[in-house]
Amino acid sequence: MPDIWFDMDGTIADLYGVENWLPMLRAENPAPYVAAAPLLKMQPLARKLNQLIARGYTVNIISWTSRGGSENYNNEVREAKLKWLKIHLSSVQFSEIHIVPYGTPKENFGTGILFDDEQKNRESWNGIAFDEKNIMEKLREL
């Protein structure tokens, strides 16, 4: 079974919908990463991911820290993203969670299926890649 990978910001977490998200990130405030609303219904997503895990798939996270963030801020962003996952997808046992510096090539971390809102990441991925639209429909096809 292939690995399934999820980006977070703009894919499952609505970072860009948080009021004043960009000024807060520039001020190295990690709050928007925790405050981001889910971009889809988390209960059905968690249920589907757990079904796929039971069938032998691995479910993983590959997400970037903030662009231009200091090392300390990037550590805070990692913690904020882990907190977001614990709040919204606590029942999912992720095999791997990589929260890496902004711009790190995601294809260095895995293969299989990627859900990511950034076209560049989808194009360079080693496997099948989908955008953030219709995630549940794509998962149901597996």
Describe these PLM feature segments:
Residues 62, 99-102, 130-132:
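Conserved beta-strand termini and adjacent loop/short-helix elements that scaffold enzyme active sites
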